[in-house]
């Protein structure tokens, strides 16, 4: 991968600044996409049953409309109040109108996106495939928080991510196209088969279909040879997180964040690192 990129002294800082701006938009995506899904289900059900829609359900609600506002006082957020991190500090973490405390998660997501975008640029340099890495990073951040909040992995995000992975690998951007296609198919099939066996033995559903599509998307980006490492690392992360959450809060752990975190780590790690791990996993010690 390194031979495809040219490291520019401006690549990392520019990508980091872009990440801050994108992170601000991802906060909107993380909040609104689940709401859009639930509103869509409600509207569909009511129309099917010939029930009237409320005024709120009839209004346009998407990633662009209505304008962002304070959830308590409903006063629209001004442009200068949307400056990543800076506006949070200037407002001292409170709404300018009603002084309601603003969640620290908003600037943290902006900062996280900026840092991860910078790391992608540092890994891949100044090249067209860096764009693919930034797109993948933005999707994974959004899916991580959406799944953690709601246990949804929206088809509107996982399915395009599969196709984007295949498109960026048409000429071997990250992995050969054949490996990308096989990775998508094997990724989906492996989790589907595992869950089918689990349900057959226990009568319970182990994970949702969204997880199958997410690992298929990661397979499309990372290739089939990365799947053993992906499953191994995500299983470790998922196991630790599930134990911690069960003990601390008594909550169930969504597996999606474990997949997204491990997928991003593998994506940005040096080839020699994850290939060594992959070899260790596929060659038993004698």
Swiss-Prot record:
GO cellular component: plasma membrane
InterPro entries named in the record: Peptidase_A24A_bac, Prepilin_IV_endopep_pep, Prepilin_pept_A24_N, Prepilin_peptidase/N-MTase
Predominant location: membrane
Transmembrane domains' residue ranges: 10-30, 102-122, 126-146, 157-177, 181-201, 224-244, 250-270
Gene Ontology biological process: methylation; signal peptide processing
Keywords: Cell inner membrane, Cell membrane, Hydrolase, Membrane, Metal-binding, Methyltransferase, Multifunctional enzyme, Protease, S-adenosyl-L-methionine, Transferase, Transmembrane, Transmembrane helix, Zinc
Record-listed Zn(2+) binding positions: 70, 73, 95, 98
Coiled coil ranges: none
Membrane topology type: Multi-pass membrane protein
Pfam families, alphabetized: A24_N_bact, Peptidase_A24
Enzyme Commission number: 3.4.23.43, 2.1.1.-
Described function: Plays an essential role in type IV pili and type II pseudopili formation by proteolytically removing the leader sequence from substrate proteins and subsequently monomethylating the alpha-amino group of the newly exposed N-terminal phenylalanine.
Protein family per UniProt: Belongs to the peptidase A24 family.
Designated name of the protein: Prepilin leader peptidase/N-methyltransferase
Biological classification of the source: Bacteria, Pseudomonadati, Pseudomonadota, Betaproteobacteria, Neisseriales
Gene name tied to this protein: pilD
